[in-house]
């Protein structure tokens, strides 16, 4: 979590500069239409903050530095050992712990944000390739319900091949109905 949010700022700034848009990250964020993404950029990415205790925010840099020095290498080691020991090409798990809610200001609250990324956050912070496959639509929300696959470091192409094979098994979902 600290790695992805902290690096989102730098990566977006680099992208905007390299692509020659002439826009700043703040200008791009001003035009974000999705309330949850806008909330994340305005509340966390641009000010370089992370969710803290009791619905507060804290400076991201100390947590990022600690993650890069200690937590990330330990997580990468754990994943590497898990994939090797169990001879796995991928780990499969639900993308999110519950059916997504519609995009609105509450969907980007710190509590909801943390809850919705909790399953995908470890692999992301370890720098692993990940692939999300929509499998069904929620009964009432009609929003996609997905399965996530994380692969060993450097297995991007193999993970895509696995995803394409699974698409043959599960098929493709129709687009959610327009609201």
Which stretches of residues belong to each language-model region?
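Structural helix-boundary/capping segments
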Residues: 14-21, 57, 125-179
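Small-aliphatic-rich amphipathic alpha-helix that forms the alpha element of a beta-alpha
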Residues: 78-81, 110-134
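Glycine-rich, N-terminal phosphate-binding loop of Rossmann-like dinucleotide-binding domains
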Residues: 95
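Acidic helix-start/capping segments at beta-turn-to-alpha-helix junctions
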Residues: 1-4
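Short, surface-exposed loop/helix-turn segments at secondary-structure junctions
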Residues: 64, 100-117
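Short helix-loop capping/hinge segments that flank enzyme active sites or metal/cofactor-binding pockets
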Residues: 6-76, 89, 134-144
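Glycine-rich phosphate-binding loop signature in dinucleotide/nucleotide-binding domains
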Residues: 84-87
């Amino acid at each position: 979590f600290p790695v992805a949010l902290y690096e989102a700022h730098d990566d977006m700034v680099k992208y905007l500069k390299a692509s020659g848009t002439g826009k700043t990250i703040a200008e791009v964020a001003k035009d974000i239409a999705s309330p949850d993404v806008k909330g994340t950029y305005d509340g966390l990415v641009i000010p370089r903050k992370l969710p803290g205790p009791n619905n507060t925010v804290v400076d991201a840099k100390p947590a990022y530095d600690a993650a890069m020095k200690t937590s990330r290498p330990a997580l990468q080691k754990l994943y590497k050992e898990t994939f090797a020991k169990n001879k796995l090409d991928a780990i499969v798990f639900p993308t999110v712990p519950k059916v997504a809610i519609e995009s609105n200001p509450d969907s980007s609250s710190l509590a909801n944000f943390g809850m919705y990324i909790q399953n995908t956050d470890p692999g992301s912070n370890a720098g692993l390739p990940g692939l999300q496959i929509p499998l069904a639509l929620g009964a009432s929300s009609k929003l996609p319900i997905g399965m996530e696959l994380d692969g060993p470091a450097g297995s991007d192409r193999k993970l895509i091949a696995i995803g394409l094979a699974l698409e043959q098994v599960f098929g493709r979902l129709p687009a959610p109905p327009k609201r």
